[in-house]
């Protein structure tokens, strides 16, 4: 085991704080409409330019092990926010830095770190309650477009595309973002069903560039059990070959001889075939296979129904205009199912949603509903160069997650103002002792950091702007750093999804509060880079002393 270095109290916290600052300072330049870009060096290909906080955070690795620990903890804040809400990563980083900074000062002054943490947790609860109370439901398409625009750094075109996509596939549909081959950004809406299972073997791939299977006008065999041998299937496979159409097999699993035979036939070109595992587990899998059957106008082959594989005929197979399968997902587009059957299935699922008491079941039922009733919208992001396309794609991704979050939990005023207003609610918060009170105060100060940073990035004086906003008691009153004016942010369309703001403060406080309770840090000692072992004596030709 390698030797370790241990640092304690002030030493440890100073090093950690330096790491936090390096990462947060690199990330926070991207905050707000006038935030700048960060260029990331790539070991291969062109450098990447981005304004996405989490992308910057993920690139940072520091040489000093102790500083790196601090940086990685804050990186965790950004990636957790990205996972939960898909946006708000920079805000979360700025908040975490502010809490750690203030907290470290208080610990250095001799306060109890555990009580500080309790105070911080109390404050965060109060802030979240205030955000939820003042959250406003998203009702119009315009509001969705505004959320998208703000999240895409003021790019109204992206906001409009997202609002259109949400309108076409509904709040329950699937939206994906791809890189376009042209200069223009375009929206493509595909009716279809997507589930999270990819191809069983990469040998089924038909489009090697995108590593995916693309099949047009395909037959779909929906089988509930495993396929290990193909003997029972041979009559059906021969019938499919006669039609010249491709076949997609959806089964619990395809293994051994069956998989080998399918792959060999696919490679020889005799049979256009691909196999995917059935989505879900247990009863849910049965229900999802039934959904696919109804959508494609086929029959789910199940022993419960007394149908055996050898008796399956072509008219029992589902049909779809297009099936796309990549490593992780399968999308079935334009299934041949009857509209009346699909509608009956949709209302059946809606009835189950009404009846269920389990949140988990409800969520899964809603997913199934989305797959049947919604569709798939693809936003293809264009640009002049690859670097520009990647940068725009980052922003579209952020905006897409933000619009989803807005529909889920509603909206609050943007520009860091919702957090500023929440900080006012902390003034009378009751705590058990003075150290907890200081913990609350730490959060209260930190809540002004995002608004301050947005102003600083716009070349304004952060403290003056924050003071001005707090003087006016109107909840939505704030500073539009794009135009440099004080306005009602909601009517101006400067809004943030409640979920994004909520996860930002929760994740920031969670990690930052733990950081300030750190008393010792352990890291491996850097290896000393000495020269290699010397040549053994007596090398060369024996007996010849020079």
Swiss-Prot record:
**Recorded catalytic activity of this chain's protein:** ATP + H2O + a folded polypeptide = ADP + phosphate + an unfolded polypeptide
Which SUPFAM superfamilies does the record match to this protein? GroEL apical domain-like (SSF52029), GroEL equatorial domain-like (SSF48592), GroEL-intermediate domain like (SSF54849)
Protein location: Cytoplasm
- Show the InterPro entries listed in the entry: Chaperonin_Cpn60_CS, Cpn60/GroEL, Cpn60/GroEL/TCP-1, GroEL-like_apical_dom_sf, GROEL-like_equatorial_sf, TCP-1-like_intermed_sf
- Give the protein family: Belongs to the chaperonin (HSP60) family.
What does the function comment of this entry state?
Together with its co-chaperonin GroES, plays an essential role in assisting protein folding. The GroEL-GroES system forms a nano-cage that allows encapsulation of the non-native substrate proteins and provides a physical environment optimized to promote and accelerate protein folding.
Q: What is this protein called?
A: Chaperonin GroEL 6
Species per Swiss-Prot/TrEMBL record: Bradyrhizobium diazoefficiens (strain JCM 10833 / BCRC 13528 / IAM 13628 / NBRC 14792 / USDA 110)
């Amino acid at each position: 085991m390698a030797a370790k270095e241990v640092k304690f109290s002030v030493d440890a916290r100073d090093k950690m704080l330096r790491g936090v600052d390096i990462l947060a300072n690199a990330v926070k330049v991207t905050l707000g409409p006038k935030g700048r870009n960060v260029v990331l060096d790539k070991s291969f290909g062109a450098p990447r330019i981005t304004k996405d906080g989490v992308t910057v955070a993920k690139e940072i690795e520091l040489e000093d092990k102790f500083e790196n620990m601090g940086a990685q903890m804050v990186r965790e804040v950004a990636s957790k926010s990205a996972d939960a809400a898909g946006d708000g990563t920079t805000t979360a980083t700025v908040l975490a830095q502010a809490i750690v900074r203030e907290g470290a000062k208080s610990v250095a002054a001799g306060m109890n770190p555990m009580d500080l943490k309790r105070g911080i947790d109390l404050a965060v609860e109060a802030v979240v309650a205030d955000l939820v109370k003042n959250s406003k439901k998203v009702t119009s398409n315009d509001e969705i477009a505004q959320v998208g625009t703000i999240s895409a750094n003021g790019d109204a075109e992206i906001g409009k595309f997202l609002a259109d996509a949400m309108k076409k596939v509904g709040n329950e549909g699937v939206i994906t973002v791809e890189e376009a081959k042209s200069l223009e950004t375009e929206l493509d809406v595909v009716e279809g069903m997507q589930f999270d299972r990819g191809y069983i073997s990469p040998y089924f791939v038909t489009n090697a560039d995108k590593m995916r299977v693309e099949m047009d006008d395909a037959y779909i065999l929906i089988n509930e059990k495993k396929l290990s041998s193909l003997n029972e299937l041979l009559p059906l496979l021969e019938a499919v070959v006669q039609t010249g159409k491709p076949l997609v097999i959806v089964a619990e699993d395809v293994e051994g001889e069956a998989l080998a035979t399918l792959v060999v036939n696919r490679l020889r070109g005799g049979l256009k075939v691909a196999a995917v595992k059935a989505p879900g587990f247990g009863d849910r899998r049965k229900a999802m296979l039934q959904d696919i059957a109804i959508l494609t106008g086929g029959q789910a082959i199940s022993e419960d129904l007394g149908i055996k594989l050898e008796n399956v005929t072509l008219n029992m197979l589902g049909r779809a205009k297009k099936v796309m399968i990549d490593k992780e997902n399968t999308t079935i587009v334009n299934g041949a199912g009857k509209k009346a059957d699909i509608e009956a299935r949709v209302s059946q699922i809606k009835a189950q949603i009404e009846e269920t008491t389990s949140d988990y079941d409800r969520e899964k039922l809603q997913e199934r509903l989305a797959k049947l009733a919604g569709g798939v919208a693809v936003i293809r992001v264009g640009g002049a160069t690859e670097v520009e396309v990647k940068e725009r794609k980052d922003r579209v991704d952020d905006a897409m997650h933000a619009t989803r979050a807005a529909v889920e939990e509603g909206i609050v005023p943007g520009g860091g103002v919702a957090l500023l207003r929440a900080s006012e609610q902390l003034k009378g918060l009751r705590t058990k002792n003075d150290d907890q009170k200081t913990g609350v105060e730490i959060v209260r100060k930190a809540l002004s950091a995002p608004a301050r940073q947005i102003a600083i990035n716009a070349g304004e004086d952060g403290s003056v702007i924050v003071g001005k906003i707090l003087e006016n008691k109107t909840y939505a009153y704030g500073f539009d750093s794009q135009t440099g004016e004080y306005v009602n942010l909601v009517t101006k369309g400067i809004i943030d999804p409640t979920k994004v703001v909520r996860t930002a403060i929760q994740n920031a406080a969670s990690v930052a509060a733990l950081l300030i309770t750190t008393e010792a840090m352990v890291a491996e000692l850097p290896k000393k880079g000495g020269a290699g072992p010397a040549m053994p004596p007596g090398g060369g030709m024996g007996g010849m002393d020079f």
